Amino acid sequence: MSKPLESYALIGDCETAALVSHDGSIDWLCWPRFDSGACFAALLGTRLHGRWLLAARDPEARITRRYRSKSLVLETRIETRDGAAVVIDFMPPRGKNADVVRIVRGVRGHVEMDTELILRFDYGSTVPWVNRLPDGTFRAIAGPDMVVVRTPVELRGKDLTTVARFVVKKGDSVPFVMTHGPSHRAAPKTIDPEEALRETEAFWHDWVAQSRVRGKWAGAVTRSLITLKALTYAPTGGLVAAPTTSLPEHLGGVRNWDYRFCWLRDATITLLALMNAGYYDEARAWRNWLLRAGAGSPSQLQIMYGLAGERRLTEYEIEWLPGYERSRPVRIGNAAHGQLQLDVYGEVIDALHQARRGGIKQSREDWDFQRALLTHLESVWQQPDQGMWEVRGEPRPFTYSRVMAWVAFNRAIRSVELFGLDGPVARWRAMCRKIHDDVCAHGFDRKLGSFVQSYGSKQLDASLLLIPTVGFLPATDPRIQGTVRAIEKRLLVDGLVRRYDTHSGHDGLPDGEGVFLACSFWLADAYVLMNRYGDAQRLFERLLDIRNDVGLLAEEYDTHAQRMVGNFPQAFSHVALINTAQNLARAAKPARQRAASAYQNATPPVD
């Protein structure tokens, strides 16, 4: 049986990440990149699909864990009848090779420990050839991959696994270092695990020290910022949506997607979260990734790209993995990369506008690229698309897609007004009026008193909560207040927000999914804009309670099973948490910042 997602903690080196369960098993690790094949895939199968267990032999051991200070170094404390020990798990910031370090330290008495290492390359399908090198290093090779393990513990082979049993006493420190490298090269050089620990903690402490986050929810926001940093692919600045694939949105269902890619839709809210927290280097790197990935013909702009901007993200299914909680299929790649989703044009142009407002300089070529996007958008904004939820049914005229088309032209006008850029402002103003009138005429249902998911539909959609946030209409407008009331009435489940009604059968998939956590943060943001601060704070604190013991959130939450579902941890959820906390803190307000971008009273930053 699969372990609850709540049982997992994240470690990473800003190029890939691993999930460590409460019982001391690393059940998911893709090497050397987030989107590489997994060498530990027990998360989506069984222990025989790859894992690394390091745990007390005593099944009654009491386990507690935490991240050491403000870092991504995980410390698990083990208490038995005979003693106590801690296991320290981390991945040093990437050097020449990729390492996972595990250090067992004796705290009191003695603790008997077991380790079981099952390496299975290519998502659990390939058993490697394992041998011992003259210096005692264990080496596993299959195809292009090599993994070496170094430890003073005497390892031995048993039934295609590597196992050991040892005792740690008070004052002992027993390290394990596992390193990945290409199989055609010599075994990677060893590292000093204690020095690596000091350097890793220093890396995270120095990074957190740059933060401007203060106030009541600073701890939660800082943990979410650390999670975003861990999900950033450092060589390019791209931010993966999650380090996992195919964790189901509905237990036992088919809504299982690969999220190890970078979505343009996350652009604006991510930039605001990073800039407001003081992380301009990361914001600049994300902006630069955005420009590189989207470069080329505007008609070929995709909704998502690979870590380095790769465009071919071909989707296929792997049959040998039974799936998390037997939820199949297990998918690699994501076919949504080829969908038409018109909202991404507005997201890209809004993100670049917010970067400008934040003082991040852009070149003439960057502006030319944005103008080319706008010229293309003029000819396609009325086309039906798959919408922001990437439905796999027939394309439709989604209301939010049209709203974001308006945002694209609106932000272009503001860029000209605020920064002296050149452009056909009169034509763009006419486009804004045309799109605004079109949305208000066809995207609003007078009988419902609410905006609707798509033109002519009676369905609601949580994306409509973003209409005041992007400045399309003020939160005081009766149509916005009616939309919020309708969503409260029809999309709330146990106080949390569904994306839309999957039972309607319009998205091309069987019904059923959890509540989408980012949508509940959007409702809290709408409450802030409507001056419903008490409602916003209560909802926000309810969402904080959903986090697991180390502060992580998945994509969704199953209110019936009372457990997280969907890919984990989810960047979108953590970005939404950061921005809502900042909105509530009243110091830096991403919702008001973004809405204010639509109006002329915004002032440019001092460079």
Can you annotate each of these PLM segments?
Residues 1-607:
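Acidic, mature catalytic/reactive cores of soluble proteins
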